[in-house]
Amino acid sequence: FGSLLGICLMTQIITGLLLAMHYTADTTLAFTSVAHMCRNVQFGWLIRNLHANGASFFFICIYLHIGRGLYYGSYLYKETWNIGVILLLTLMATAFVGYVLPWGQMSFWGATVITNLFSAIPYIGQTLVEWAWGGFSVDNPTLTRFFALHFLLHFIIAGLTFIHLTLLHETGSNNPLGISSNCDKIPFHPYFSTKDALGFILLLFPLMTLAMFSPNLLGDPENFTPANPLVTPPHIKPEWYFLFAYAILRSIPNKLGGVLALAASVLILLLIPLLHTSKQRTMTFRPLSQFLFWTLVMNLLILTWIGS
């Protein structure tokens, strides 16, 4: 899945760059500029749909990648794992600020709700939020800085990916038995190149299918309405890939407690390497650990379902 994440990143950067050329980061024009892009720019609709749904595929790949890392004990490469967690956090930040850019209803209210969570931090919270907003509500300054951040964060992700790969290169990759791969080393081309090419096709085919046939399947219909600070949508919810965290946030009646639980749900990944006590690296021959792992997976799926 690592190679698929690489192709996702490249696709997102290319489509995003083309979109940025036609986008206007201004509250009065953002929504219209996106509409103009889809109507009047050559293949603009396709580029936009690929970029929007590409994010979904990016998250599918990264969740599978993390799941596989947990299953096969890859987190014992501590440096690689920790950079990976930082990559996940950066990706989540990027997806969040990117979702605000079309300036629809859900963009605006999603931004309002999530940035507001910073106000739960004692003492400095309120100041922090107003500083992030650039005013007393989500407005033009917020949109312009979110566009700048969205543009910047992709290159940060690309840089971190390079570090991630360099650290992995120090040790070599893991395998399902958790033993040394030295005796199994084979030439990259034609073996791995073919395997990767197949992966790319299996990734890009469903992405193209989704972008062509039902591009709005995963989006929120509220986002077809331009942002209106005076009308709150009946159900404020993020894109599907954040629903598990959002469900955790909403299920705790205390604001600070919810924020901490939300942060912990992702940051717990940093503790995983410290919690490994087995003599075996992978879960291949550990049925009890397997049971717990699949329970975790089901938990995440149920939380995602509840969150919607």
Swiss-Prot record:
Lineage, broadest ranks: Eukaryota, Metazoa, Chordata, Craniata, Vertebrata
Q: How does it sit in the membrane?
A: Multi-pass membrane protein
Q: What is this protein called?
A: Cytochrome b
Localization of this protein: Mitochondrion inner membrane
Residues that, per the record, bind heme b b562 = 51, 150
> Which InterPro entries does the record cross-reference, listed alphabetically?
Cyt_b/b6_C, Cyt_b/b6_C_sf, Cyt_b/b6_N, Cytb/b6-like_sf, Cytochrome_b_C_euk/bac, Cytochrome_b_N_euk/bac, Di-haem_cyt_TM
Q: What else is known?
A: Heme 1 (or BL or b562) is low-potential and absorbs at about 562 nm, and heme 2 (or BH or b566) is high-potential and absorbs at about 566 nm.
Self-association state and partner proteins as the record states:
The cytochrome bc1 complex contains 11 subunits: 3 respiratory subunits (MT-CYB, CYC1 and UQCRFS1), 2 core proteins (UQCRC1 and UQCRC2) and 6 low-molecular weight proteins (UQCRH/QCR6, UQCRB/QCR7, UQCRQ/QCR8, UQCR10/QCR9, UQCR11/QCR10 and a cleavage product of UQCRFS1). This cytochrome bc1 complex then forms a dimer.
Q: Which organism is it from?
A: Zaratornis stresemanni (White-cheeked cotinga)
Q: Alphabetically, which GO biological process terms does the record hold?
A: mitochondrial electron transport, ubiquinol to cytochrome c
